[in-house]
Curated annotation (Swiss-Prot):
Name of the gene this protein is made from: GBP6
GO BP: any one term: defense response to bacterium
Region named GTPase domain (Globular): 1-310
Top EC group: hydrolase
Alphabetical list of PANTHER family matching this protein: GUANYLATE BINDING PROTEIN
Catalyzed reactions: GTP + H2O = GDP + phosphate + H(+)
Post-translational modification summary for this protein: (Microbial infection) Ubiquitinated by S.flexneri IpaH9.8, leading to its degradation by the proteasome, thereby preventing its ability to promote host defense against bacterial infection.
Pfam families: GBP, GBP_C
The name this protein goes by in its record: Guanylate-binding protein 6
Keyword Phosphoprotein: no
Residues that coordinate or bind GTP: 45-52, 67-69, 97-101
Subcellular location, principal: cytoplasm
Length: 633
């Protein structure tokens, strides 16, 4: 589903059967195929309030999510519909329709609370749908929001400063939209026109008083204002006054509905398509379809085990899976690019190392892009080990290819020489000179052959070594030479052989140096890209912390302006803690990153020193190649 899913109808994502929540594997399989970022819109509200109609409209259909034309609630659990996003390229719009809250047919009301909490955790835009007006009763019916502190955790362990875990909800909670259906009031306050958003904000103002009833009424208002910094309201007229049309609204054309209702619905959909955010987790981790599936499974498993869904734990679970996939993705990219770009044998080792460096640099970037929360760089080290092994394979293939190619060329060039030796053509007076001239022509022709690769000298050296006994025999049997001339020829041959061995050793030492420089370059590239990623993560964390502080300060100031001084003072501890967090993030930047990079540098040094075996391969491992590809001379 890289280019967008093709779901013709919604499927159940989370089943709610016999008071037990269960993730539907069919839905997970659909999400697994969506690697695009997702915009997730969830709608929640009392049953029979028309939630499904709005979701169908967002999907561009007038049917799909079951509407139900009776007082019986149709939707059970959470249903999902994935459609290509109409205005965000390469994004998928995931619509989540939840079963109606407060259904009298349901047994355990706790399931309503879990459905509500799951919708908050999974979506990036949370739509609360109610009827008629936002009044005291409507807010009381939204008591589920007050239970979120008991049903969701940001951190896996309590904070040492004693500040409530829920203070961090604002960093990952969705945008909050309140849709009011069959709205009949005038949008006015104290005789003055107001906007829909102003209507909502006025309804969320706290009521003065200390009695339990007032406090109970204020609690959902307070929670909405504290947990959801971005809020918006949409009101809708009644779709039609015709009861028959209402009962079959999924079969009714838009033209048969009230024009004002049509306009309001289109405005709502346009806002969702334009402003609904891509789903992210803390510190800017983008959620794709497959990641959303993992989150759903993780949260439901936590609920069924009797635990509370925890964002931190969910991110850790997600990171383990995603980082393993990132290692594989980056390593596969490296292999594919090397196979495409490198033509074996390379003329020099440096040519291969340069290509390796380029492909590795791009592969590291891919790993960085798709990994997160890589504690102690565990997965980056796995990626490095994998890449080093793959690099070693390419080095061996390059050497083997060079050996094969050079041997084939030498076989071709020395064919006449070998035939002359077999025929005894050099076993005559003056035969040694003739033999040497023939061998020199072979050497000249051999070095004219292009792109012989890294084993060119070594293969030719072995050829010369294979000829030493033959040359000695021809030399000693040549009656045209004096003993002194023969002795001089022997000395010259030994000297030339020693010089060629020195050249070969020099090449191997140079290649060792190139290998070590390449490893150092690899280490530095890994550290540089990690440093850039850590700095970006730190900047995102700082922005997140500043956002939490500013929102908390706004809420605190609002309490003061509305006359709730005690609530204002109660938030001082939270604000002080946010300021300390920001100071720590700002001031501990360099030491923290430096420590992480130092640790990685040590680990990479250990990893990269292991392929010393590969470096040494050029010195002591080549004999195995010659055993596999024996020379015929």
């Amino acid at each position: 589903m890289e280019s967008g899913p093709k779901m013709l109808a919604p499927v159940c994502l989370v089943e709610n059967n016999n008071e037990q929540l269960l993730v539907n594997q069919q839905a997970i399989q659909i999400l697994e195929k969506i690697s695009q970022p997702v915009v997730v819109v969830a709608i929640v509200g009392l049953y029979r309030t028309g939630k499904s109609y709005l979701m169908n409209h967002l999907a561009g259909q007038n049917h799909g999510f079951p509407l139900g034309s009776t007082v019986q609630s149709e939707t059970k659990g959470i249903w999902m519909w994935c459609v290509p996003h109409p205005s965000k390229p390469n994004h998928t719009l995931v619509l989540l329709d939840t079963e109606g809250l407060g259904d009298v047919e349901k047994g355990d009301p706790k399931n309503d609370s879990w459905i509500f909490a799951l919708a908050v955790l999974l979506c990036s835009t949370f739509v609360y749908n109610s009827m008629s007006t936002i009044n005291h009763q409507a807010l009381e019916q939204l008591h589920y929001v007050t239970e979120l502190t008991e049903l969701i955790k940001a951190k896996s362990s309590p904070r040492p400063d004693g500040v409530e875990d829920s203070t961090e909800f604002v960093s990952f909670f969705p945008d909050f939209l309140w849709t009011v259906r069959d709205f009949t009031l005038e949008l006015k306050l104290n005789g003055h026109p107001i906007t829909e958003d102003e209507y909502l904000e006025n309804a969320l103002k706290l009521i003065q008083g200390n009695n339990p009833r007032v406090q109970t009424s204020n609690f959902p208002r307070e929670c909405i204002r504290r947990f959801f910094p971005k809020r918006k309201c949409f009101v809708f007229d009644r779709p039609t006054n015709d009861k028959d049309l209402l009962a079959n609204i999924e079969k009714v054309s838009e033209k048969q509905l009230d024009p004002k209702f049509q306009e309001q619905t289109n405005i709502f959909c346009s806002y969702i398509f334009t402003h609904a955010r891509t789903k992210t987790l803390r510190e800017g981790i983008t959620v794709t379809g497959n990641r959303l599936g993992t989150l759903a499974v993780t949260y439901v498993e936590a609920i069924n085990s009797g635990a509370v869904p925890c964002l931190e734990n969910a991110v850790i679970t997600l990171a383990q899976r995603e980082n393993s996939a990132a290692v594989q993705r980056a390593a596969d990219y490296y292999s594919q690019q090397m196979a495409q770009r490198v033509k074996l044998p390379t003329d020099t080792l440096q040519e291969l190392l340069d290509m390796h460096a380029a492909c590795e640099r791009e592969a590291i970037a891919i790993f960085m892009e798709h990994s997160f929360k890589d504690e102690n760089q565990e997965f980056q080290k796995k990626f490095m080990e994998t890449t080093m092994n793959k690099k070693g394979d390419f080095l061996l293939q390059n050497e083997e290819s060079s050996v094969q190619y050079c041997q084939a060329k030498l076989n071709e060039l020395s064919k006449g020489l070998m035939e002359s030796i077999s025929a005894g053509s050099f076993s005559v007076p003056g035969g040694h000179k003739l033999y040497m001239e023939t061998k020199e022509r072979i050497e000249q022709d051999y070095w004219q052959v292009p792109r012989k690769g890294v084993k060119a000298k070594e293969v030719f050296q072995r050829f010369l070594e294979s000829q030493m006994v033959i040359e000695e025999s021809i030399l000693q049997s040549d009656k045209a030479l004096t003993d002194r001339e023969k002795a001089v020829a022997v000395d010259r041959a030994k000297k030339e052989a020693a010089e060629k061995e020195q050249e070969l050793l020099k090449q191997k030492l140079q290649e060792q140096q190139q290998q070590m420089e390449a490893q150092d370059k690899s280490r530095k590239e890994n550290i540089a890209q990690l440093k850039e990623k850590l700095q970006m993560e730190r900047e995102h964390l700082l922005r997140e912390q500043i956002m939490m502080l500013e929102h908390t300060q706004k809420v605190q100031n609002d309490w003061l302006h509305e006359g709730f001084k005690k609530k204002y003072e109660e938030m001082n501890a939270e604000i002080s803690q946010f300021k300390r967090m920001i100071d720590t993030t700002k001031n501990d930047d360099t030491p923290w990153i430096a420590r992480t990079l130092d640790n990685l540098a040590d680990e990479l040094t250990a990893i990269l020193s292991a392929p010393a075996k590969l470096i040494g391969h050029g010195v002591k491992g080549v004999s195995s190649l010659f055993k596999k590809h024996k020379l015929p001379f």
